[in-house]
């Protein structure tokens, strides 16, 4: 992602402090998302046996992360202020989809409705045409009229 943002000169701030904040959020996502997908998602939705301790432990961590995001977005349009960048793309792909798409059928369990700022931010990003295209790739179709693209080989796959 960083390579592409640098190569095309978009979505990555060039000013040092703005770039550092963007990279901090990008690396925050890399360090935190495994708790959401690999931890919470696995034990809550996919594990053959349901154990209360890991479900509660990972749920607590996911809620803490949602709280971090919600507080940051309280006075900001995007993660780093007024400008959309790669950190928004990376974080929204996990946490935005959790609050908007009821990932793992856990919206009620995690009380995602209480994270109003995360929802507002995710809704705005989810309306962006490029984000809409990106969420179609490598996702299992949910029905006969679904526009999911299992594998992408060419830009025309998104037409």
Per-range role (PLM):
Residues 10, 71-83, 129-134:
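Surface-exposed helix-capping loop/turn segments at secondary-structure junctions
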Residues 135-159:
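Acidic/histidine-enriched, glycine/proline-rich intrinsically disordered or flexible terminal extensions
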Residues 69, 88, 125-131:
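Residue-level signal for nonpolar/aromatic packing positions in well-ordered secondary structure
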Residues 36-41, 79-107, 113-120, 125:
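GST superfamily/GST-like fold recognition
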């Amino acid at each position: 992602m960083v390579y592409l943002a640098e190569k095309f000169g978009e979505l990555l701030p060039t000013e040092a402090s703005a770039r550092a904040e963007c990279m901090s959020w990008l690396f925050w996502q890399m360090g935190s998302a495994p708790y959401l997908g690999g931890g919470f998602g696995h034990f809550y939705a996919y594990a053959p046996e349901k154990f209360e301790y890991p479900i509660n432990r990972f749920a607590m961590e996911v809620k803490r992360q949602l709280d971090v995001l919600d507080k940051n977005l309280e006075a900001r349009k995007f993660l780093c202020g007024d400008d959309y960048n790669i950190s928004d793309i990376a974080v929204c792909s996990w946490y935005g989809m959790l609050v908007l798409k009821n990932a793992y059928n856990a919206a009620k369990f995690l009380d995602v409705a209480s994270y109003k700022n995360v929802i507002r931010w995710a809704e705005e990003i989810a309306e962006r045409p490029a984000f809409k295209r990106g969420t179609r790739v490598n996702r299992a179709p949910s029905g006969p009229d679904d526009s999911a693209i299992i594998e992408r080989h060419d830009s025309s796959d998104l037409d």
